[in-house]
Design a protein with these regions (language model features):
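Predominantly extracellular/secreted Zn2+-dependent metalloproteases
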Residues: 2, 25-135, 145-167
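Bacterial N-terminal signal peptides that target proteins for export
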Residues: 2-14
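Bacterial N-terminal signal peptides
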Residues: 15-22
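Substrate/cofactor-recognition hotspot
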Residues: 138
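Walker B catalytic acidic pair
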Residues: 141
């Protein structure tokens, strides 16, 4: 092969690698929130942070445990110094691809132990009509990201506990 052919071949490989990396990178990137969904999450997150300034509200982190029996406060301490710092690290992303978001009236979805919350299309309406509930749901999902499973406790029980502690 000539030098010119080798250079062209090298450029083609490099171009293909760049395109593949860009495609893979975009496919793996979480869907960012836009418009009202983003504003609804920002507003509810700010409200949740204000509620968590209360010592009584922060007790929700010791009210629940993960599957290994550790309190969520212990899991929080492993990750960061405060609930406010941790909530700032948790991405809230578009949940339109999630079955629970498509098939139910669920507002937010999180997997126990995974630091990510999916935002369903109903969340913005909840935040608009019942801002206190939206703030409680943010805290509820943060508990899941720290390892809290469900059933038991039920989703309703978790939200009720958050509402009782975080008035």
């Amino acid at each position: 092969m000539s030098k010119k052919g080798s250079r062209s071949s090298g450029r083609a490989v490099l171009t293909s690698a760049i395109l593949l990396a860009a495609t893979v990178g975009n496919a793996a990137a979480p869907l960012t929130l836009t418009g009202w969904d983003r504003r609804a999450v920002e507003t509810a997150r700010r409200g949740a942070l204000k509620r968590l300034e209360s010592e009584e509200c922060r007790k929700v982190f010791i009210d629940f445990t993960d599957a290994q029996g550790r309190t969520l406060q212990q899991n929080l301490e492993k990750r960061t110094a405060s609930p406010a710092e941790y909530i700032g690290l948790v991405p809230f992303v578009d949940g339109s691809s999630q079955a629970l978001c498509r098939e139910t009236k669920t507002a937010l979805v999180a997997t126990p132990g995974v630091r990510r919350v999916f935002v369903c299309r109903t969340f913005a309406e909840v935040q608009l009509r019942q801002p206190g509930l939206a703030e409680s749901l943010v805290i509820h999902e943060i508990l899941h990201t720290l390892g809290l499973g469900e059933n038991p406790p039920t989703s309703i029980e978790i939200t009720q506990r958050v509402q009782a502690r975080c008035r």
